[in-house]
């Protein structure tokens, strides 16, 4: 089964307490994200890439502005191309909450022709939600790794998990995913 991992928005502004839009506890999932990304056959890492005057800043504080430290991914979430000579990580920048707003994503998914998508990152009820439900539209197996996501609103996250299961998605754990590799 061809599997592609989706590392959603694990950027400095979200995952560290000093970040502009810190998700509480996100730094604690970084070691597992690092392990998943390291062992993934292929990982697509989405990244917010906002301009200084991005309309999203009417809803959320300034974060992940292009060229700032906060927009970068923590080094531990990047795969090491030097080991194999080729990268197994595709960075997909986006200016909106939904990664499917990137014109690169749909053609990329068609090209990759995966059977299974494994999703993790931040924020569970926002960008992870958009990615997971968008991937369900591909009629492939889509799994959210529940111990490797973090929410701003736990109630909304649990509601999202329920809707995701009802829509045909699966919930899994990092131990199960890692054991399957």
Per-segment meaning from a language model:
Residues 32-36, 126-137:
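Histidine-anchored nucleotide/phosphate-binding helix
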Residues 8, 48, 122-124, 147:
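Cofactor-binding loop segments of dinucleotide-utilizing enzymes, especially the Rossmann-like FAD-
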Residues 1-93, 141, 152-153, 157-181:
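Active-site acidic carboxylates
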Residues 50-52, 97-99, 125, 150-151:
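Short, catalytically relevant binding-site loops at active-site mouths
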Residues 72-125:
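Internal catalytic-core helix/loop-beta-alpha segment
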Residues 118-121, 141-154:
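A short glycine-rich beta-strand->turn/loop micro-motif centered on a GG-aromatic cluster
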Residues 56-57, 102-104, 130-131, 155-156:
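Short, well-ordered secondary-structure micro-motifs
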């Amino acid at each position: 089964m061809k599997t592609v991992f989706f590392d959603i928005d694990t950027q400095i502004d979200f995952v560290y307490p000093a970040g502009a839009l810190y998700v509480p506890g996100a730094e604690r999932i970084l070691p597992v994200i690092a392990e998943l990304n390291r062992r993934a056959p292929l990982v697509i890492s989405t990244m917010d890439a906002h301009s200084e005057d991005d309309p999203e800043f009417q809803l959320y504080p300034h974060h992940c502005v292009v060229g700032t430290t906060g927009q970068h991914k923590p080094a531990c979430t990047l795969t090491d191309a030097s080991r194999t000579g080729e990268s197994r990580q595709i960075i997909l920048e986006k200016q909106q909450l939904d990664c499917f707003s990137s014109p690169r994503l749909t053609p990329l998914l068609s090209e990759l022709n995966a059977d299974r998508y494994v999703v993790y990152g931040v924020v569970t009820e926002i960008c992870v939600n958009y990615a997971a439900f968008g991937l369900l539209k591909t009629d492939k197996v889509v799994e959210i790794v529940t111990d490797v996501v973090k929410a701003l609103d736990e109630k909304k996250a649990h509601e999202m998990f329920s809707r995701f299961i009802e829509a045909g998605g699966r919930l899994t754990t990092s131990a199960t995913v890692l054991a399957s590799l």
